[in-house]
Amino acid sequence: MIEKDISKPEDSFTFPRTGHISRNRSVLAAMTNKQSHKDGSISDQEIRWLNRRAEGGFGIVTTAAANVSEDGQGWEGEIGLYHDRQIENFRKLVSLVHNNGGLIFAQLFHGGMRAPELLTGKIPISASKIPFKDSSTGFTRAASLSDINRIIQDFSLAAERCVKAGLMELRFMEHMDT
């Protein structure tokens, strides 16, 4: 049994842990649009695209997946947060979205076995060595303990970059698969 009224989409929402308030419950999901620069920095075109969502009334805007490691890039035009030089354009995006009344979240990502060797120059990494047609060896590379610790550290450093850019919340995902 519901003990209180269900909120309406136009109602604001307060995040219990952080106290941040979204002006409404309309959330732009993370969508890949392949507009970022080759070095992973978010482009002015992508900044404009995301900011238009805030201008249009979304309470929360979520970035496309942002890779945390150079070897974790899953596709061309993907946002990166694996280097400090990528913070400034993120800061610009955050400022614009906030000025238009929205909150912005980043989706941090490592492509794992879905990070093509053609983009990264490295054999895709996975939880175990398995057949994989997009690898020059025909297999993924099994993640070592060192790899796992490095990727954890990469997520941590990317999260710190998000904080430096002023992002409010983070979402995490990876593709280590089998």
Which positions does each model-derived feature cover?
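N-terminal capping/small domains of soluble enzymes
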Residues: 1-109, 151
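Short connector loops/turns at beta-strand edges and beta->alpha or beta->beta junctions
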Residues: 33, 66-69, 131-133, 176-178
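Short alpha-helical interface elements
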Residues: 52-53, 78, 83-86, 115-125, ...
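Short beta-strand segments at enzyme active-site cores
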Residues: 61-64, 104-108, 165-178
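Short acidic/His/Gly/Ser-rich catalytic and metal-binding motifs that mark active-site loops
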Residues: 69-73, 115-117, 178
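Non-globular sequence segments
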Residues: 95, 103, 109-167
